[in-house]
A protein has these predicted regions:
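Active-site/ligand-binding surface loops and adjacent short beta/alpha elements
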Residues: 63, 73-166
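Residues that act as N-cap/strand-start positions at coil-to-secondary-structure junctions
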Residues: 1, 35-37, 82, 144-146, ...
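Short, well-ordered beta-strand segments enriched in hydrophobic/aromatic residues
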Residues: 41-43, 50-58
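A short, structured loop/turn motif at beta-sheet edges
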Residues: 5-16, 44-49, 78, 82, ...
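Short, acidic/polar linear motifs in exposed loop/turn regions
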Residues: 59-61, 225
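Extended, loop-rich substrate-binding clefts of extracytoplasmic carbohydrate-active enzymes
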Residues: 1-47
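Active-site pocket scaffolds in enzymes
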Residues: 156-227
Length: 228
């Protein structure tokens, strides 16, 4: 359903812009979500990495609830070696207790010994047991600087893949599809899963966009050597 609306290539970068419109006349989503809106995603690929901006504009006459998340798989291994050479770190805070349907109950739990390694030291997330967990976002330190995002590091070579998010992201779902596949998904979300039905939706990141207004968020994927 997305259409490429702009594409520019220079010596330094490639930019692609895609747009998607939802309204009563052309989109089945409108039947279940009766708000007319425009979604625009802009990609910039350069020496800085892959930068992504998503923009939603409310074209309806009522406030539009909006929660944005990405199901982002990071391949592991990605630079040679074995699963055991790689660890993931993520800017996580408290863990969200999940019910039998994997929906947050509203209770926040301190990180256990396993998930505390996401903040410091790193956690092996492939070739291991299944992981399906949700967390509030809290910045970590990487090389002495505050960092808001996830990263995967090859401990043998020092090569790192960073997945950086802005302050629109408030929650992570981390999922490794059983643990025996060559990827793990640190999934950034603007609100806690099922936030509209929470006891305190705003505390879980719930937001609504006013008519004619826009909401945007930015993300960046890039590769660095440890210490750079």
């Amino acid at each position: 359903p997305f259409q490429v609306s702009k594409a520019v290539e220079t010596d330094d970068e490639v930019m692609v812009e895609c747009r998607y419109y939802s309204n009563a006349g052309c989109d089945v989503i409108f039947r279940d979500f009766p708000h007319e809106f425009k979604c625009k995603i802009i990609f910039h690929l350069s020496a800085r990495g892959l930068e992504q901006e998503v923009v939603f504009t409310n074209r309806s006459r009522e406030r539009m609830p909006l929660g944005v998340g990405f199901h982002t798989p990071l391949r592991i291994p990605f630079a040679g070696g074995e699963n055991g050479d790689y660890v993931m770190r993520v800017a996580v805070g408290e863990q969200a207790e999940l019910d039998a349907r994997n929906l947050p109950t509203g209770r926040k739990l301190p990180l256990n010994a396993q998930f505390a390694r996401l903040r410091e030291g790193g956690l092996r997330v492939t070739g291991c047991e299944p992981i399906e967990a949700g967390f509030k976002l809290r910045e970590i330190e990487v090389d002495g600087k505050p960092y808001r995002g996830a990263l995967v590091e090859n401990l043998r070579t020092g090569v790192r893949v960073f997945y950086e998010v802005d302050d629109r992201t408030t929650y992570w779902t981390i999922w490794n599809n059983g643990g025996q596949v060559p990827y793990c998904c640190p999934e950034p979300q603007s609100w806690t899963t099922n936030a509209p039905n929470a006891a305190d939706p705003e505390a879980e990141g719930f937001c609504a966009v006013a008519p004619g207004e826009s909401w945007s968020a930015k993300y960046r994927l890039y590769v660095r050597q440890a210490g750079e």
